[in-house]
Amino acid sequence: MIVNLITTVYNFLWGDLFTIPLPGGSSLGISLLILLLIPTGIYFTIRTRFLPIRLFPDMIRALSEKKNEKSSLSSFQTLIVSTATRVGMGNLVGVVAAVSAGGAGAVFWMWVTAIIGSSTAFIEATLAQLHKEEDPLYGGYRGGPAYYIHDLVEDHLKKKKRYVLPAVLFAIAGLICWCGISQVISNSVASSFKNAFSIPPLYTSIMLVILSAIIVLRKNATVKVLDFIVPVMAVCYFFITLFIIAVNLRQIPSVFARIFEEAFGLRQMAAGGFGAVLMNGVKRGLFSNEAGSGSAPCAAAAAECDRPTKAGLVQALGVFVDTIVICSCTAMIMLLAPKDLIDGLSGMDLLQTAMQYHLGKFGVIFIALTLFLFSFSTFLGILFYARSNVAYLFGDKWCFQTAYKVLALVMLFIGGIAAYTFVWDLGDVGIGLMTIFNIIALYPLAGEALSELKSYEESKKS
């Protein structure tokens, strides 16, 4: 029954809301999430006057923002936390899923989602800074969509309330999403460790749960661990990919030609596959870079900044790093492998086969260990996100914080032996519901973030 419910909600969010006829008798299905994300990204890109391109140097400079309070986080640390979840499983498993289902053209639509999504990420992160509050449990600050949605409804009603329904629904959707992601984490790691080391999924799941519990059940260990893991894993993965690209340099032009040809190709339209290309690219782009979903603002709110705009710029940069850089690395690893070698494969089997082609047995081991680190950091990152949502729903009580962590650890264990499609659908349902509630709030609140952006740019001139 639960599986049927999840499938029904998944189809409502990601299934075809309506179709657009295409040449050759085929059609393009447009889902509710596509209808929300693409126009929203374009709208905010125009309203911010193409911020991702125009203010890219400012994004880099914002990383140097210093903090004054010991218990708070710097802009760079909040980027590390959000990058832990962005540069995580979505960059490996997500890209594999997108290319498996939608072909090479899905990579292009992931890029598009990232470019226009950077502006959305800026708006939501800036709003999180504007509506943050002090965190009496962990120290520093907390916030996110549940908090700015709450303030929006309170302003509309012109009265103080303990809870408002849209904020409650967002917080619940977030907790569902992160439980779903917890399952995907162990599912993917267990699969890769079985292929690389012949370790049964049960043992891998137990190991992952124990290591995670050691970190997450301690008060403020999460950020300290992520500060070390995230830069190391991202740099190692990037340079291994550069090596593979250098070895296969002559094939690069044909790979890019394939990406663009399949993104717009008449062959895909005629076969009715263009919708799958677009849908899988955008869906996996969202799952990877989180722009518009409301996840990253939970980290952005924790930053100590002299201007809220700087937190927004940092999170916009995070979207770029995640999708344009790291996701492209995974795509190149797959697309530089012979097509007949990986045809019929999916998930981690596909990626490990591609890595084995490039680097031999070392490639299989490397991708298994990389996935483990990416997934481990993702789990730590999503539990950081969950703090503010648990606090919004249940108040400043440690028992509820601990209870959700234990629930997530249980889901982490279950995911190692669960069906692949089911766990992806649960994560997609959660992130889809979050996106709906978040985007509905962004439009009436965007003026606050745009006003901050205008003030920031005027201060640069003076």
Where in this protein do the model-derived segments appear?
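Alpha-helical membrane segments and immediately flanking helix-loop junctions
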Residues: 69-101, 127-130, 137-153, 169-172, ...
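Helix-loop-helix module between adjacent transmembrane segments
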Residues: 40-45, 113-141, 150-187, 191-215, ...
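Flexible loop linkers connecting adjacent transmembrane helices
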Residues: 50-75, 97, 103-104, 119-160, ...
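Transmembrane helix-loop junctions in multi-pass membrane proteins
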Residues: 47-52, 91-95, 177-190, 212-225, ...
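Extracellular/periplasmic helix-exit of transmembrane alpha-helices
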Residues: 124-136, 242-258, 272, 302-305, ...
